[in-house]
Structures are given as C-alpha cells and as structure tokens.
Regions:
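Intrinsically disordered, low-complexity regulatory regions
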Residues: 1-96
Length: 96
C-alpha cells in the first residue's frame, strides 16, 4: 500500500516558491531564447563550457541584484534557474 504523502509545513514558503520558479522557467521556453530548435545554452553545454557558463551567470545576477532596477526578484529567479542548469551540467558530467 502507498503511504499518504505527509504535508510539510514549510517555514520559508519553499513549496510556493518552487512552483513560482517552475512557472518562471516554463515561460523561458516560450521566450526569444527558445524560438529556434535549440537554445544557445545547449550548444554551450555540449561544447564543454556549461558549468562555467551557468556559474558565471549565477555570479552575474547575484552581483547585479539591487543595482539594476532595484532589488529585482527576476534576478533571484535567474540565479535559481542558472543554478539548476549548473546542477544538470554537473549530473551530465558525472554520470556513472
């Protein structure tokens, strides 16, 4: 029998924020970067530069936060998105 999944009472609103992040990422797949069959990020990863690219963008948006258009939530979403791309790249490079 399957156990009923326990409802977690997140202290930092993680459940809602993860849903918001997924919605943000979903919208990027309809944006100008995805008009072609392949995204430029795919080529960068395939050329072996994915980790540097992703982590460089994490740093870029972290340093920009609070400077361009104030304390912009979009910069934080971009940090999280690029961190996920870095995690994907890590997993791809370290498959067993």
């Amino acid at each position: 029998m399957f156990k009923k999944k326990e409802q977690i009472n997140y202290k930092f609103n993680e459940g809602a924020l993860i849903k918001e992040l997924q919605s943000y990422i979903d919208k990027t797949y309809g944006g100008h970067y995805s008009k072609n069959q392949f995204q430029s990020t795919e080529f960068i990863i395939d050329c072996g530069h994915g980790m540097g690219f992703a982590l460089g963008n994490v740093l870029k948006y972290a340093q920009r936060y609070g400077k361009k258009e104030g304390y912009n939530r979009a910069d934080l979403m971009k940090i999280l998105h690029y961190a996920l791309i870095a995690l994907h790249t890590h997993d791809k490079n370290h498959e067993n």
